[in-house]
Amino acid sequence: MLQQWLRQSPRAARVLRGSCCRGPQSGSLRHSPLPTAPHRCIRSLQTSATESKERIPLRKQLKQDAKALKAQKRQKRASEEASRTKWELTVGIEIHAQLNTETKLFSRASTSNTDTPNSNVALFDLAFPGSQPEFQATALLPALRAAIALNCDIQPVSRFDRKHYFYQDQPAGYQITQYYEPFAKNGYVDLFPHDGIAPEDGDHVRIGIKQIQLEQDTAKSQEYPPSTQLLDFNRVSHPLIEIIAMPQIHNPATAAACVRKIQAVLQSCSAVTTGMELGGLRADVNVSIRRRDEAPGTHQYGGIGGLGQRTEIKNLSSFKAVEDAVIAEKNRQIAVLESGGVIEGETRGWTIGSTETRKLRGKEGEVDYRYMPDPDLPPLIIGHDLISNLRDSLPTPPDQLIEMLAGTEYGLSIEDAKPLIELDDGARLEYYQDVVDILRDLQQDKDAKSRGGLARMAGNWVLHELGGLCTKADLAWDAQRVPAETLAQIIDQLQRKRITGATAKQVLAMVFDGDRRPVPQLLEEENLLLRPLSRDEYLALAEAAIGQNPQMVEQIRAKNQLGKLGWFVGQMMRMGEKGRVEAQKADEILRELILGKSDQP
């Protein structure tokens, strides 16, 4: 009897697995009689009232967790606000970006990063005795595009210097850079709320760029614990630009936004091919702290004085790492100063997922690097004609594109305009503009009011509907998968009320999967053209949906929770014949029945 009951009650069986209810051990009797009196373990199977009260429903637990999380965030914001009031954070950024070139900076070796390790190296890359640097002029063009896009003054004459240090990834014992006379100076980058700056920074932050200099990259190191380290010299002498931003940033979020914006600018002008996500761009941040109620600090950086002692955090490889590392170093410095300690000028490291930075080495200064002019390289002379031609050929800057897309011509939200610009190296934006142009031609017979929202509708279909299909199928963007003309025709049919929104999505999916029939033919052959329901049919569907959930109807009436009408619209579309229920008309009928509001004359 007990065994039969246990088979039907797995939960009870779990409770019975106690020390007093174990199966017979080796050597014990195989047929032990059941106890005649109620056994203590069996009595424990009864669910007590106390146990029932302690059990918290999942929904209630989720609400409690959400409240606790909000409380933690409020406490964190309050702590950060108190910290900002007492301490001033200053951040400077140095960005190293690999240029979009086919050859290295001082040799004709390829810059391909997919070839066999140590296969793309020249004698000079490995510092063979007697080898000489040969400046590759093609590396200058993407560097100039970057400097112009970042609003820099291009210097007519610049020179190369040697930065001396000994490390395994630098075979020559020095790096060729432009420390004293860089090719570009005095630029800036503008940051706005849509770039992700901190709310307390207002609507606009301008970060100065002290200089941009050409320099060599180092070898790529790969560690294999416990003691093996391999070097790939394919990366040695890959052309880099180092962008030195002024220490004018006072918030970790704004620091990350600055790096993100500079990467977007570099990609928009084809100065680089990859960003942080693939290792083509790395950032170092300089962090300093000082008390607001004390005299200005005694240190200066980038021509700005009154700062605290700075530390440098090297080789940050993501935007989140930039923000998190600045927060961690800020907190560390505040803790040191509040305990009476002194901040040491040093180089520190950061590990993703960590909560604190770690010391790498004492900070080296200008004297330690022993900068000197490179005697093997002549001055770099840049003509005004070259600068003018490059300036005229640059694409429209991202900020101007956002302003255009969010303006009256297209009317997109900032949230939709940004990804259109940033996705697929501009291919998504070009496709979107083609769709809008074709759609406007198709809708020429409509009045201006009807055509006013076409660009916004096209943006939604390009970004969310078509983009969602690409994401779901894990496919890269391909404008030919759904030609711009085809998508414009689908939206045109939807605008003319010949198909419903659900049918439009169905047709888009069919074309995405390879159906190449013209849209009108596809709609006709698949019987997808809208056959409108009568008012009586809408009323019947609405009454059936309302009957499914009268409690929600009362909530809508009592608390004016109009958002819940969408649930009833969905029910009507599920109950009705596929492709015949129009969401707008269904909503109108529901409002009439539930709220007593009628749009009928």
Curated annotation (Swiss-Prot):
It is found in: Mitochondrion. It is an enzyme of class 6 (ligase). Residues 1-52 form a transit peptide. It comes from the Eukaryota. Its EC number is 6.3.5.-. The keyword Nucleotide-binding applies. One of its GO terms (molecular function) is ATP binding. Signal peptide: none annotated. GO terms for biological process: glutaminyl-tRNAGln biosynthesis via transamidation; mitochondrial translation. The keyword Ligase applies. Pfam families: GatB_N (PF02934), GatB_Yqey (PF02637). InterPro entries: Asn/Gln-tRNA_amidoTrfase_suB/E, Asn/Gln-tRNA_Trfase_suB/E_cat, Asn/Gln_amidotransferase, Asn/Gln_tRNA_amidoTrase-B-like, GatB, GatB_Yqey_C_2, Gln_synth/guanido_kin_cat_dom. It catalyses: L-glutamyl-tRNA(Gln) + L-glutamine + ATP + H2O = L-glutaminyl-tRNA(Gln) + L-glutamate + ADP + phosphate + H(+). Keywords: ATP-binding, Ligase, Mitochondrion, Nucleotide-binding, Protein biosynthesis, Transit peptide. GO terms for cellular component: glutamyl-tRNA(Gln) amidotransferase complex; mitochondrion. Belongs to the GatB/GatE family. GatB subfamily. Subunit of the heterotrimeric GatCAB amidotransferase (AdT) complex, composed of A, B and C subunits. Allows the formation of correctly charged Gln-tRNA(Gln) through the transamidation of misacylated Glu-tRNA(Gln) in the mitochondria. The reaction takes place in the presence of glutamine and ATP through an activated gamma-phospho-Glu-tRNA(Gln). PANTHER family: GLUTAMYL-TRNA GLN AMIDOTRANSFERASE SUBUNIT B MITOCHONDRIAL AND PROKARYOTIC PET112-RELATED, GLUTAMYL-TRNA(GLN) AMIDOTRANSFERASE SUBUNIT B, MITOCHONDRIAL. This is Glutamyl-tRNA(Gln) amidotransferase subunit B, mitochondrial.
